[in-house]
Amino acid sequence: MARLNLFYLFVTLLLSISLRPCYGLPEKTTSALFIFGDSTADPGNNNYINTTAGMRADWKPYGQNGFFEAPTGRFSDGRVFVDFIAEYAKLPIIPPFYQPSADLTNGVNFASGGAGVLPQTNQGLVVDLQTQLRSFEEVQKSLTEKLGEAEAKALLSEAVYFISVASNDYLAGYLDNPKMQEYFVPEVYVGMVLYEKGARKFGFLNMSPLGCMPLMRARNPKSSEGGCFEAASGLALAHNNALNVVLTSLEQLLKGFKYCNFKFYTWLYDRINNPASYGFKEGVNACYGTGPYGGVYSCGGKRMPMEFQLCDNADNYIWWDSYHPTERIHEQIAKTLWKDGPSVGPYKLEDLFFNKERLTIADILDAPNEEHFQH
């Protein structure tokens, strides 16, 4: 019963701004992009909030590859995958929500490094998903004031909504909190993690093999043997299985619901174990960090330990630091999401941005309400 209630709560939240398909608005070749998530997609929102060094990345060696003039707050040696997606969609780089005077008409990036779905994940240090969703409502109001109601609703209905979040709920929540382990079996915990608002077209980055991060290898009781921390990876697999079930159900419940779900676990696991096959030299150790596998997160010397090692060429590495991949992996993620059929489905992101299906304002206003799903 708890799992069923969580599922319907997810559906209700989705339907709160869910939009239904039809065919009447003028054709437009590019949709706006709205991004919700964590450090995998954060463009620098954490620069603007009161947080700790561990939740920021606006100093070197972050951003060292020179694409940006200075470190931006991205947890990478350069760009993150949503920057590439914007490029492929013929959009400018999507601005952080907290960036002053940002142009909102091409979309907004709400992602915050360290964030989770659950408010207690890194509480007080990040912008959790529920707060990100409230910020989206502010953007809706702002766009309506700027563009007028009809044009704003048309823009939002055509937009693609990308969600990359949940790792921190496990890394900073479930694994480190015995009470969470007691009260939440993985499937129920996953249900709590799947709270979302959105529209009709979604992109999802499902969970990576968490136990293979340099951080988790270093925490593995058998770290001397070099293996992944299977307890963490098992949670990721449970999450991905639950996500697949929920998305399949939503596709049946919501007419016109379309999504791109990236099988990130197997995709990244293959690169970690076979780096040379994908143009890398190192799949286990981080380019930047200290301790076993570079798994101790030093924040560029901003917190203990102050010392860290930095590789000569991040392009040879899968892992940039103890948590995060390099820009080169981010670029491969984006290319896969955009065009690669075997690892994504049932749609590619390119399909979601450039399909010819249109929405009418009448159908937007006539979206189903939550009472249809009361149980």
Show the residue positions of the predicted features.
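Conserved active-site regions of diverse hydrolases
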Residues: 2-375
